[in-house]
C-alpha cells in the first residue's frame, strides 16, 4: 500500500483545509519545496500536490511553488498534481515541467470526453479525481455538489486509459475522523481502475483497514493533516503498510 503525502498550495504556501473551505486554511509551511524534501526524506515514494487557488480559478495559480518542488524532488520520486486543469495545453505544460501525472477533477465531471482526449494525448499520465459528499460528486473546488453519483461517473472512464482514480470524501477531509472505508471499497469494487483513498486518514488503524482493502482494488492513500499535525508518523505508517502487503 502506497502512502502519498499531500502538499496543498495556497498563495505559494503549504496549507491544509477543513472540508475544502478556503477560509478554513491552516498554514503549515512557507516553503513547499522544503516540505517536499522532508516527506521524501521520511520515505515518501510519491507526492500529491494540489493547486488550491487553481482549483477555484480554473487556471494554474501556484507555478513558482510547483517549480520549486519539482526542482527539489522530481529527480527522485514521481509527483502528481491537481487543481485547475481544464485543457490539454495546461496538461502538456505541467508534464513538460517534470510532473509525472496530472489529476483531472472538475473537468472530468463536467466533460468526460476531455478525459478521453487527455488519455489519448498523454497515455498513462492521467488520473481522475472524484470528490464526493454523501456519494455525490462535487466540483469547482468542492463549491458545488452535483446530482451525479461517483460510481456512475467512475464507470464512464473505465475504457479511457485512466491510470487511477483518487476518491476524496469531502465530509472526512481535514476532519481527522477516519477514512470512509466502505465508500472507498464500494467504488473500487465497481470499477476496473485502481482507487486511491483520500480524506480523513487519522491513525494506524486506518492504514490497517486500507491495506485490508487492497484486495478490492484500493491501491494507495493520500494523507495530509494527520502527518502535519503528528497523529501519524509518516515513516512509521509507510513501514506498517509495507509490512502488511
UniProtKB/Swiss-Prot annotation:
GO terms for biological process: L-histidine biosynthetic process; L-tryptophan biosynthetic process. InterPro entries: Aldolase_TIM, His_biosynth, HisA_bact_arch, Isoase_HisA-like, Isoase_HisA-like_bact, RibuloseP-bd_barrel. The active site is at residues 8, 131. It catalyses: 1-(5-phospho-beta-D-ribosyl)-5-[(5-phospho-beta-D-ribosylamino)methylideneamino]imidazole-4-carboxamide = 5-[(5-phospho-1-deoxy-D-ribulos-1-ylimino)methylamino]-1-(5-phospho-beta-D-ribosyl)imidazole-4-carboxamide. GO terms for cellular component: cytoplasm. GO terms for molecular function: 1-(5-phosphoribosyl)-5-[(5-phosphoribosylamino)methylideneamino]imidazole-4-carboxamide isomerase activity. Pathway: Amino-acid biosynthesis; L-histidine biosynthesis; L-histidine from 5-phospho-alpha-D-ribose 1-diphosphate: step 4/9. It is found in: Cytoplasm. Its EC number is 5.3.1.16. Keywords: Amino-acid biosynthesis, Cytoplasm, Histidine biosynthesis, Isomerase. It is an enzyme of class 5 (isomerase). Belongs to the HisA/HisF family. PANTHER family: 1-(5-PHOSPHORIBOSYL)-5-[(5-PHOSPHORIBOSYLAMINO)METHYLIDENEAMINO] IMIDAZOLE-4-CARBOXAMIDE ISOMERASE. NCBIfam families: 1-(5-phosphoribosyl)-5-[(5-phosphoribosylamino)methylideneamino]imidazole-4-carboxamide isomerase (TIGR00007), PRK13585.1 (NF010112). This is 1-(5-phosphoribosyl)-5-[(5-phosphoribosylamino)methylideneamino] imidazole-4-carboxamide isomerase. It comes from Neisseria meningitidis serogroup C / serotype 2a (strain ATCC 700532 / DSM 15464 / FAM18).
Amino acid at each position: 500500500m502506497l502512502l502519498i503525502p499531500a502538499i496543498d498550495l495556497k498563495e505559494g504556501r503549504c496549507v491544509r483545509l477543513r472540508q475544502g473551505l478556503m477560509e478554513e486554511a491552516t498554514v503549515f509551511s512557507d516553503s513547499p519545496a522544503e516540505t517536499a524534501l522532508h516527506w521524501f526524506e521520511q520515505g515518501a515514494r510519491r507526492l500529491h500536490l494540489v493547486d488550491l487557488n487553481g482549483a477555484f480559478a480554473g487556471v494554474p495559480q501556484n507555478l513558482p511553488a510547483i517549480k520549486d518542488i519539482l526542482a527539489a524532488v522530481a529527480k527522485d520520486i514521481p509527483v502528481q498534481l491537481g487543481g485547475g486543469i481544464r485543457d490539454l495545453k495546461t496538461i502538456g505544460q505541467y508534464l513538460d515541467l517534470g510532473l509525472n501525472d496530472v489529476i483531472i477533477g472538475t473537468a472530468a465531471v463536467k466533460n468526460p470526453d476531455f478525459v478521453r482526449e487527455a488519455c489519448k494525448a498523454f497515455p498513462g499520465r492521467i488520473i481522475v479525481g472524484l470528490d464526493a459528499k454523501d456519494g455525490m460528486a462535487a466540483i469547482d473546488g468542492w463549491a458545488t455538489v452535483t446530482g451525479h453519483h461517483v460510481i456512475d461517473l467512475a464507470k464512464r472512464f473505465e475504457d479511457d486509459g485512466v491510470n487511477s482514480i483518487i476518491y476524496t470524501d469531502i465530509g472526512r477531509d481535514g476532519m481527522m475522523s477516519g477514512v470512509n472505508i466502505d465508500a472507498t471499497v464500494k467504488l473500487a469494487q465497481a470499477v476496473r481502475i485502481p482507487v486511491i483513498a483520500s480524506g480523513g486518514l487519522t491513525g494506524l488503524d486506518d492504514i490497517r483497514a486500507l491495506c485490508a482493502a487492497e484486495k478490492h482494488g484500493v491501491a494507495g492513500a493520500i494523507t495530509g493533516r494527520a502527518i502535519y499535525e503528528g497523529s501519524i508518523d509518516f515513516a512509521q505508517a509507510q513501514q506498517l503498510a509495507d509490512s502488511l502487503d
